[in-house]
Amino acid sequence: MSRVCQVTGKRPVSGNNRSHAMNATKRRFLPNLHSHRFWVEGEKRFVTLRVSAKGMRVIDKKGIETVLAEIRARGEKY
């Protein structure tokens, strides 16, 4: 399973670790992902999404029904 938020599309980005001597070594910054079950009142069932912390805030703001409609419009499965 890829490390991508199903709501926001956040994915790993690359950058550098920096030592005290400012030597650079490559590293990845991973999104804060969680598998979370959301109750969808319209469908009377739970839906499990892999979402970032920001994705959960977006769901709180817009509502799960709206977010699922956006995911469906992109052609993603959930």
From Swiss-Prot:
Cross-referenced InterPro entries: Bacterial_rp_bL28, Ribosomal_bL28, Ribosomal_bL28/bL31-like_sf, Ribosomal_bL28_bact-type, Ribosomal_bL28_sf
UniProt keywords, alphabetically: Ribonucleoprotein, Ribosomal protein
Similarity section: Belongs to the bacterial ribosomal protein bL28 family.
One Pfam family named in its UniProt record: Ribosomal_L28
Protein's name in the database: Large ribosomal subunit protein bL28
Domain of life of the native organism: Bacteria
Gene it is expressed from: rpmB
GO molecular function: structural constituent of ribosome
UniProt-annotated stretches for the region Disordered: 1-21
Any GO BP: translation
Assigned GO CC terms: ribonucleoprotein complex; ribosome
SUPFAM superfamilies: L28p-like (SSF143800)
